[in-house]
């Protein structure tokens, strides 16, 4: 765990120090925008640091996607997660996740210890024509699909 003082953002230098101190780190997770304080982490700069390491770069953009700059590919983000209920100002109940090619490669070689969050199941169902959810979708997801 890399803790920072309340109301401050993690720095790229602190991330680099943590990664240098422990070569077994498999992933770094950063909250882009901390809702209660409004503090935004420098995800672009942290992404530059992450390019030198094999660890996955995971960013929580629940309260920032759509309102702040979060260019997933350009910033080197391997996994980006968001929800509909905060910055997107949509009804709650939907989540979106992106995986980089590197994250997909790593996911293919892991047997997840979770049923619902098995990304391989989502990919397999998403490749169908028409795409579908591997599990019962939320009512908001069904409505979104109809609108699109």
Feature map (PLM): residue ranges:
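Short, acidic/turn-prone active-site loops that include or flank metal/cofactor-
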Residues: 4-5, 63, 84-87, 102-103
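Active-site phosphate-binding strand-loop segment of PLP-dependent enzymes
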Residues: 10-64, 79
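Conserved active-site segment immediately N-terminal to the catalytic lysine
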Residues: 73-85
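Active-site C-terminal subdomain of aminotransferase-like
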Residues: 87-148
